[in-house]
């Protein structure tokens, strides 16, 4: 359990202080307006500043992999300010890519003066050197860019590489740095060493990430100055294209116009100009990461002791009064009920904030965590309707890179196209190869759907697939029966059916309609045979055949059908993931709830990103099932109405399964008329869950915070990442209630509060991360507000729904400063990395 500060802000004011915004700030004609035209310049308050240099923020993209398409990389390359091209001194092939990469960058940017530095990495492997220092220097001089040699392992020249690049870049307060290079050259290692002073031998090359770090660099010209006449001109062009007049400068410009955090936060100095208001936000936020369930905590013998008055559990903060040899009285810190004659031995008294009780042992047939994951089932449920034959233009960035690799110079030969189904056909075989290495015994099933549903397994390779058509598509019970007839022992393993499945996928062709509902039900029935199984649906259209059909039909029957499918999946701990194709419509407002309520992922992506998205699903496995979480606050506090019914101090949340990226937050406040004054506020979270080995446990997490009526005290030294995550999730919850204007106001107020609290480098980094998320929500919210005003039938389309879903489930890695990021998830395995590097993308 985490809190942004050490305090609970208590106020008895019936009228909460307001934040005011002008009509201009709330304009629906732009998505780049922020709360104030001028933001604080943090260069004077950098915690890393030692009296020299300028504080700047580096926004660094780690371009995972090689040529695989990524919308994130596309955006960064187009809007990047400067580029680091990395090769490995023990790999001549990676060195030979340097010139191609530089040409590629210049063609995309349409400039020949892009700030670039060449980095020769792995100088700790001098004995294996294939590229001499002289040869690399000569190439750098011929390309008119600086060259530096580094070792991510020993941290040699790591900072200097980034600082040199920034010094060669037109002056700004935020720099988008793009790190590029061939596979295995150490791009990730360089970035992590720079951010966290840490080295990991093997990184998973498929995980793309961005990092923010505020640093102090000497030798920078003043803002508005230029390196030379030519770069000054290019700087103007770059700033315009990257949106610097929007988000970035607005965060960090206006040096002397912003009051101190204490002044900004004080109720007496709140700006009351404006026509639109919302309640001022507070730092009364609670957060809990489900990743903690995979961490060991002290095991308490015996049964837990419940308060007879409110069902809170005895904790280390409870005041036990000894009344006999092993007898105690406990006056509950929550409800003040006096619990008497409590019999406890010393080992039964909790002595840590987090403790655990075993509720039941696993059955003798239970297996280990790893084997349960490996023995589970994954069903790829693929849309092969006619619309999957629609072609999409390959983004010019991707085409440019392919041409660069081929050594093609000059103008592109013209746009190239790829169908949605072809993207699927190139994505899933790669994933099957990966599963064959990671989980060779995992069962893999291919289900396709058009106007009929087909089930492919190796056992039916002779007779052909099982075909479901006609009236069967309307029969719920028969569809379940067909799915469960595919018994577990008949299902092929990833390693044993790799060639068969890849051949079938390659032979798929688009035909006719979209029987998504029946295909989903059959897939869920197959998956129900093993806990921790998952279904991956890839579709581009609204269901229009069989059960669950939506197109041109009443929604009631379809909603009822998908609710039944959801219950089936929940009962069997199955996760359902939905991947939609951008530019299509699948009605996530109805279908998406199946994924949301089974803790799956909902994603709308470019067809070329299918491989990346499908792979990501296996990189975040479940860690617990049957989770019931009770959050208990003191009776004088109440939970925000979007997290519980109005006015409650306790809320219970249930999850069929959770993973390590499930981070929960809630907002709370003091009641308008508190019944008592409390100096120390207790908090407790009770989590009943089942481990992957079958053990049923109860984890009790307790905490205490000091009360304060002073707003400034309550926000001092705030953990910005917790506030950012909580406010982002809250805005998404509000938007999902179709209160789009209130959601936008909430984000505006959050920006105002968080910005006023920033002092340290880490706080500024995390504020920047929050602003990136806020900007991502801004356009969808404006679209929904306009649609609602115009009385459009569906104010939120699939694109907006997907953004709100993503933001509701945003986790710490999105908002934490670079130094706090958990890089353990970046560790890779040599065999898997080799398999990925051998893939050739087109």
Swiss-Prot record:
What GO cellular component entries does it have? COPII vesicle coat; plasma membrane
Region (Disordered) residue spans: 253-274
Recorded hits in Gene3D superfamilies, A to Z, give: P-loop containing nucleotide triphosphate hydrolases, von Willebrand factor, type A domain
SUPFAM superfamilies registered for this protein in UniProt: P-loop containing nucleoside triphosphate hydrolases, vWA-like, Zn-finger domain of Sec23/24
Q: Which UniProt keywords apply?
A: GTP-binding, Nucleotide-binding
Family membership noted in the UniProt record: Belongs to the small GTPase superfamily. CpRas family.
Q: Which domain of life is it from?
A: Eukaryota
Composition bias, Polar residues: 259-274
| Disulphides | none
Mind listing the GO biological process terms from this record? endoplasmic reticulum to Golgi vesicle-mediated transport; intracellular protein transport; signal transduction
Q: Where are the transmembrane segments?
A: none
Protein name listed in UniProt: Circularly permutated Ras protein 1
Q: Where does GTP bind?
A: 62-66, 121-124, 181-188
Q: What is the lineage of its organism?
A: Eukaryota, Amoebozoa, Evosea, Eumycetozoa, Dictyostelia
Q: Name one Pfam family in it.
A: Ras
Alphabetized GO MF terms: GDP binding; GTP binding; GTPase activity; zinc ion binding
Per UniProt, residues of the VWFA domain are: 377-627
How does the record comment on the protein's domains? In contrast to other GTP-binding proteins, it is characterized by a circular permutation of the GTPase motifs described by a G4-G3-G1 pattern.
InterPro entries for the chain: P-loop_NTPase, Small_GTP-bd, Small_GTPase, Small_GTPase_Ras-type, VWF_A, vWFA_dom_sf, Znf_Sec23_Sec24_sf
